[in-house]
Regions:
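Hydrophobic membrane-insertion alpha-helices, especially the h-region
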Residues: 18-36
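A structural signal for short, hydrophobic/glycine-enriched beta-strand patches
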Residues: 39-194
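A transmembrane-helix-recognition feature enriched in membrane-embedded lipid enzymes
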Residues: 194-216
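Amphipathic, soluble alpha/beta structural segments
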Residues: 10-13, 85, 89, 202, ...
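N-terminal Lys/Arg-rich, disordered targeting/topogenic segments
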Residues: 1-16
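Residue-level recognition of hydrophobic positions within alpha-helical transmembrane segments
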Residues: 14-16, 28, 201
């Protein structure tokens, strides 16, 4: 009976399989290194210390509160809040756009109301909030402060680099635009890849930046 039982041969050495395992390990290490550097790349903190600050009014309330903290210790003479029509809830809000809503929020957070001016855009977030806001700011500066050639843009977390890119593209090389990234409460700055919201926001902003930076 034993003569008919065949023993399974030991698995032979497979160099191709080991090579694939090594390549996979290297790939995982590279992805981990890359993920640790994606957020800082998307969310730079590089102000030019101009006299004017431009605030992305579509930031969440807690991000606007952090913005107010940064503004409190600054030398900005004027603060422009930007943003288009509210994406939802406008029927129940006394503020028709993010610019005016952000202005009111900053005032509640302690920012001097005399230093804040709302500069509303004409489009919603889905229709191109950043570009429309850049156009509105450019128009306001041309009409009211034509001598201004540099300012700092306060933008939400990983959207900061893309926001500066769009503002620079809209206003042109005659403007020097700094950027200050305001952390978002629900998006970890380091281990963002471990949360669904982090993956959605950071991954989405990375793709959006590539789309806006590379002409098609």
């Amino acid at each position: 009976m034993e003569a008919f039982i065949q023993k399974k041969p030991l698995e032979a050495h497979n160099p191709k399989k080991q090579l694939w395992l090594f390549a996979l390990s290297v790939l995982l290490i590279l992805l981990n290194i890359l993920s640790n550097n994606i957020y800082p790349f998307l969310a730079p903190d590089a102000p030019v210390n101009g006299q004017i600050a431009v605030v992305a009014g579509w930031m969440p309330d807690k991000a606007l509160a952090k913005t107010a903290e940064r503004l409190a210790g600054s030398d900005y003479q004027l603060i422009l809040t930007s943003g288009g029509e509210l994406e939802y809830g406008s029927l129940f809000s006394e503020y028709p756009n993010y610019a005016e809503l952000a202005k009111a929020t900053l005032q509640i957070d302690g920012v001097d109301s005399a230093a804040v001016i709302a500069v509303p855009a004409q489009q919603t977030v889905k229709a191109g909030e950043i570009a429309a806001s850049a156009v509105a700011v450019r128009t306001w500066l041309a009409e009211n402060r034509p001598e201004v050639t540099r300012f700092d843009l306060f933008a939400p977390g990983p959207q900061a680099r893309r926001a500066r890119l769009i503002f620079h593209r809209t206003l042109g090389d005659s403007f020097e635009i700094g950027v200050i990234s305001i952390p978002l409460e629900n998006v970890p700055t380091r281990k963002w890849g471990r949360s669904g919201e982090g993956l959605r926001v950071v991954g989405g902003e990375l793709l959006a930046l590539l789309h806006d930076a590379v002409p098609f």
